[in-house]
């Protein structure tokens, strides 16, 4: 997947910045006694943790106005099988996934509205040989409309929908206790267990889900992230930093080595390209498998970028005084 021009320029600019040698703060001081940029050492540190797959995340999260690749203008994507038991039935800019278990199907996210649920998700499932009537649970990773908008279509069919308590608020409130996701909660269908994590910051109740996937019979552990980008200022960034620490610890213990990106190339451009272009996939190569160590390094990079942004916000506020 090619980076768009805005992303490419951002990556080039940040590459120049972070490859500058670290010099004493007094030497970095500009003309007129301007204070040095205290965020630069953190940005440089984050850059050392990244690699080509995560440059898009680095460019997005290591500056205040990083490129936004999720533009809400996507079309229906080609439905495809990602693993033996995981399928994609979303759009080109935002995802919907189906996990197949021996106890039925689990749908993650529902696109923008009931019309997209009916015209994209359901036909996509049928094209892949999945029966929509076998859906046992619908999970909304968070309350933003591009993930939850199709929920009424599935609730009208009497399906169980699960959302975190905090994110049920914008959706009209939880209908019952069984509809609320709790941190560390495990839901099991057949032989498949799904572990939920609360990772607030993108919304007050964003969740992530961990579950086993199989690639030609080989077991892996996948993480489906609802959203990690903060939607607010310093306080929300600090919340995200805590959420990343929680995510890192839980995924390390679980051995997560597969990461599912919620949007177009927000986390990993190679992974999204793999999802979008099934006809270009190479035999015996699944680009969604990143490895446990690589993912842990990514969480460290992301946390460091968020710390840098906190410093940027503080410097911006100080400069305005």
Segments from the language model and where they lie:
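Metallo-beta-lactamase
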Residues: 105, 112-114, 177, 186-188, ...
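Active-site HxH/HxHxD metal-binding segment of metal-dependent hydrolases
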Residues: 32-42, 48-49, 115-186, 279, ...
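Sec/Tat signal peptide C-region and signal peptidase I cleavage site
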Residues: 23-27
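Zn-dependent metallo-beta-lactamase
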Residues: 28-104, 114, 316, 321
């Amino acid at each position: 997947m090619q980076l768009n021009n805005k992303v490419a320029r951002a990556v080039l600019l940040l590459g120049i910045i972070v490859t500058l040698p670290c010099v004493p703060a007094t030497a970095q001081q500009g003309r007129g006694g301007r204070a040095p940029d205290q965020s630069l050492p953190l940005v440089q540190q984050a850059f050392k943790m990244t690699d080509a797959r995560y440059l898009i995340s680095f460019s997005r999260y290591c500056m205040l106005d990083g490129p936004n690749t999720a533009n809400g203008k996507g079309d229906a994507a080609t439905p495809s099988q990602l693993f033996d038991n995981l399928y994609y039935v979303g759009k080109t800019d935002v995802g919907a996934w189906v996990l197949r278990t021996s106890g039925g199907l689990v749908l993650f996210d529902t696109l923008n509205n009931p019309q997209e649920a009916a015209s994209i998700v359901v036909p996509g499932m049928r094209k892949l040989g999945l029966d929509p009537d076998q859906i046992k649970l619908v999970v909304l990773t968070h309350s933003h409309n591009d993930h939850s908008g199709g929920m009424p279509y599935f609730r009208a069919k009497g399906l169980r929908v699960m959302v975190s308590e905090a994110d049920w608020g914008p959706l009209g409130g939880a209908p019952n206790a069984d509809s609320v996701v709790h941190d560390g909660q495990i839901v099991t269908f057949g032989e498949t267990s799904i572990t939920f994590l609360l990772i607030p910051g993108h919304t007050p109740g964003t969740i992530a889900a961990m579950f086993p996937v199989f690639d030609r019979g080989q077991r892996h552990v996948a993480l489906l992230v609802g959203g990690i980008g903060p939607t607010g200022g310093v306080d929300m960034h600090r919340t995200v930093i805590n959420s990343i620490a929680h995510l890192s610890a839980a995924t390390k213990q679980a051995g997560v080595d597969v990461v599912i990106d919620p949007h177009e190339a927000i986390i990993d451009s190679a992974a999204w390209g793999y999802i979008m272009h099934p006809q270009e996939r190479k035999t015996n190569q699944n680009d969604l498998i990143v490895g446990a160590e690589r993912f842990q390094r990514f969480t460290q990079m992301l946390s460091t970028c968020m710390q840098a942004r906190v410093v940027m916000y503080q410097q911006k506020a100080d400069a305005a005084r």
